[in-house]
Amino acid sequence: MLSNIIPLSIGAALGATARWLLNLAVPASIPPATGNLFANWIGAFLIGIFAETVNHPQWKLLLITGFLGSLTTLSGFSLETVTLLQLNRPASALANIFLHTAGSLLLTWLGLKIGAAVK
């Protein structure tokens, strides 16, 4: 059990730190939700690559469950979307939903293709 918790925890700490740093790196002139969008897109792309190339169970725990699970954020996406709706900005909320969903699906597909080619 501990042999699984350690890589999972390391990955989670690194993923959460990466998301925080990514949000800090987004310039103030860009809408605040952009950091989470980038995190979700990066995570979607990387999960495609990792799904094709990572076979060892502990590396999967570290990279996919830990790192990408902490890097990406459904809860942040949900809060951003609901906040836009509460601010009576339905077009922005729909754009947020589309960008996160369509972008993530496209990037996961691309990651799978690249991962399969590299494998």
Swiss-Prot record:
Na(+) binds at residues 69, 72. One of its GO terms (biological process) is cellular detoxification of fluoride. HAMAP family: FluC (MF_00454). The chain crosses the membrane at residues 5-25, 30-50, 59-79, 97-117. One of its GO terms (molecular function) is fluoride channel activity. It catalyses: fluoride(in) = fluoride(out). It is a multi-pass membrane protein. It is found in: Cell inner membrane. This is Fluoride-specific ion channel FluC. Keywords: Cell inner membrane, Cell membrane, Ion channel, Ion transport, Membrane, Metal-binding, Sodium, Transmembrane, Transmembrane helix, Transport. GO terms for cellular component: plasma membrane. Belongs to the fluoride channel Fluc/FEX (TC 1.A.43) family. InterPro entries: FluC. The lineage of its organism: Bacteria, Pseudomonadati, Pseudomonadota, Betaproteobacteria, Neisseriales. Fluoride-specific ion channel. Important for reducing fluoride concentration in the cell, thus reducing its toxicity. PANTHER family: FLUORIDE EXPORT PROTEIN 1-RELATED. Pfam families: CRCB. The gene is fluC. Na(+) is not transported, but it plays an essential structural role and its presence is essential for fluoride channel function.
